[in-house]
Design a protein with these regions (language model features):
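Surface-exposed, charge/polar-rich loops and edge strands
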Residues: 1-239
Length: 239
């Protein structure tokens, strides 16, 4: 099969495109391995005994992804919401309330999701769970840069110290209000995610490009092989 310069150019482009697809597939496999390694660490930390939180000065790394228990009183007056949080397709907000574990320290608790027509405002009074509570859940680092719960930004606006982590109550820790008004967040997904299926798709795309280019080159070469004898045949006999 003889290839023209144009054929070689097309083949080179196909190889480059296929190589990019293969690299994307390998990248997805790398992300899969990273996720599995991360999940293994999280699973191991969650299996450790629960930490009893009695101070807001605990380093976040000492409780990150671990089960914790804390007892205190709710400070509803300084409650925050995270807007634009959907739950099963319904607009709403996440409700974060400081739980005062002492007179001069508190930990923000993500009490769950509440429906909100504008995904911003809720009736805070209807979401109260009583004056005091014992909360069991998982600890996560408080997001930096979010002024509503960033401990650094809240340092001068609250009359007490705030922990550098947030508690998300366990799904089994039902709120003391109607479930239609406040729902605990489900447990975080520790599955593999879509990375493996994405990798397979990228590898499949690479195969399709190479196979398709090979078929196209064979077809073009076959067409040229048929056209050349036709041009060599005289249109009429010479007498």
């Amino acid at each position: 099969m003889k290839l023209t310069p144009k054929d070689w150019l097309g083949a080179a482009i196909a190889v480059v495109v296929a190589a990019v697809f293969v690299r994307l597939g390998i990248w997805q496999l790398d992300r899969l391995h990273q996720r599995r390694a991360r999940n293994a660490v999280v699973t191991a930390r969650r299996s450790l005994p629960a930490v009893t939180v009695t101070s807001a000065a605990l380093p976040v790394d000492s409780v990150r992804d671990r089960r914790v228990t804390l007892t205190g009183t709710w400070d509803y007056a300084r409650e925050r919401v995270w807007g634009a949080r959907t739950y099963e397709g319904v607009p709403g907000v996440a409700v974060l309330t400081p739980l005062k574990i002492s007179s001069d320290a508190a930990v923000f608790v993500d009490r769950g999701w509440a429906p909100s027509a504008d995904a911003l405002h809720v009736d805070h009074t209807a979401l109260r769970e009583g004056d005091s509570a014992t909360v069991t859940g998982l600890a996560f680092a408080a997001p930096r840069g979010r002024g509503d719960v960033d401990p650094v930004r809240l340092r001068d606006s609250l009359p007490y110290a705030v922990a550098s982590f947030i508690i998300q109550p366990s799904p089994s820790d039902s709120p003391a209000v109607r479930l239609s008004d406040l729902r605990r967040w489900p447990a975080s997904d520790l599955g593999d995610g879509p990375h493996l299926s994405y990798a397979i798709q990228w590898f499949a795309f690479a195969g399709i490009v190479l196979i398709g280019m090979g078929a196209l080159l064979r077809k073009q070469a076959s067409s040229r092989g048929v056209e050349q004898p036709r041009r060599a045949t005289p249109s009429s006999e010479t007498v």
